[in-house]
Amino acid sequence: MSESVHTNTSLWSKGMKAVIVAQFLSAFGDNALLFATLALLKAQFYPEWSQPILQMVFVGAYILFAPFVGQVADSFAKGRVMMFANGLKLLGAASICFGINPFLGYTLVGVGAAAYSPAKYGILGELTTGSKLVKANGLMEASTIAAILLGSVAGGVLADWHILVALAACALAYGGAVVANIYIPKLAAARPGQSWNLISMTRSFLNACTSLWRNGETRFSLVGTSLFWGAGVTLRFLLVLWVPVALGITDNATPTYLNAMVAIGIVVGAGAAAKLVTLETVSRCMPAGILIGVVVLIFSLQHELLPAYALLMLIGVLGGFFVVPLNALLQERGKKSVGAGNAIAVQNLGENSAMLLMLGIYSLAVMVGIPVVPIGIGFGALFALAITALWIWQRRH
């Protein structure tokens, strides 16, 4: 059955506004919860190497449910899927508030996030299309990064004041996202009537993976976004250990302020990409990807706060300019071949596999005692080389 698409000529339709608000609140909760839970781990004297494990159980949920969440997004009204997923996040955050093991509660939030992601991006192609899709992605990324900016800072600052207050604020944000989802129009399911046999769903997902991987443009997008988000998540945890070593600051708030600089930069970069890059000129974003690694390397050598702020903002600008066109390319090509929901689910599998791999290597490096500054230098150099290799491969094919 072909995918039905519902579009609106206005980029600021009622439905689009509801999606952006819901995304902001949901992402605010995600980022505040991460830093609030990290503060909880520190307060309960968990070892340093366990910090990235928290994110690994989160992304593990993405990987485990990857064969199924794309079909869920395409089989039901995407706004309702988003509401259900935010309800799961609310339950996970509340469980941590009430003393449940933080790794278990955070895993439940990860399950909600896994269900949420294909729906939140897939719905953009139903509310708008064509040239407005890149701009809609820019709005989505800007909303997400604004939420990362405010959520990260709120999580760290509130945790320095009282950890339980920080956790409760996360639960309230998820509750607000559930309410915002109610105002998203109930669009027709994109691909109703598909089989719910788990074996068939897994086979269908693997077929979608194969289809997207065989297409040069979507393979290029999948690899690029996977490298970017894997590196981005690893950088967040690198900052938590880098700040006390390089700057001599031991509070919970400073790493969140530094993460906020990345967030501000990504908003700027996403806006620039929406104006300067189209689906036909996606390769313009590649030099920015290479420079991300170079700037991370330079950043790792800093010992003063102001240069660190400036370099992290530059990393964000480069990151926003790099990732927004790649997201739009995958959605547009994927919608026509395997369905937007399935395309985003495959993208999530790639991105979260990269996160799991990079976080695992980072956690292992910390566990065996490699100093955080050499870890940062190696991380930046390897990322720059990886994006360079991807660009060379893309130009040849």
UniProtKB/Swiss-Prot annotation:
Q: Which residues form a coiled coil?
A: none
Q: Does the keyword Protein biosynthesis apply?
A: no
Gene Ontology CC terms, in alphabetical order: plasma membrane
Keywords noted in UniProt: Cell inner membrane, Cell membrane, Lipid transport, Membrane, Transmembrane, Transmembrane helix, Transport
Q: How does the record classify its membrane topology? A: Multi-pass membrane protein
Q: What residue intervals traverse the membrane? A: 18-38, 53-73, 91-111, 145-165, 167-187, 227-247, 257-277, 281-301, 305-325, 344-364, 367-387
* Described function: Catalyzes the facilitated diffusion of 2-acyl-glycero-3-phosphoethanolamine (2-acyl-GPE) into the cell.
State the name under which the record lists this protein.
Lysophospholipid transporter LplT
Q: What is the species listed in this Swiss-Prot or TrEMBL entry?
A: Escherichia coli O6:H1 (strain CFT073 / ATCC 700928 / UPEC)
Lineage of this protein's species? Bacteria, Pseudomonadati, Pseudomonadota, Gammaproteobacteria, Enterobacterales
Q: Which gene encodes it?
A: lplT
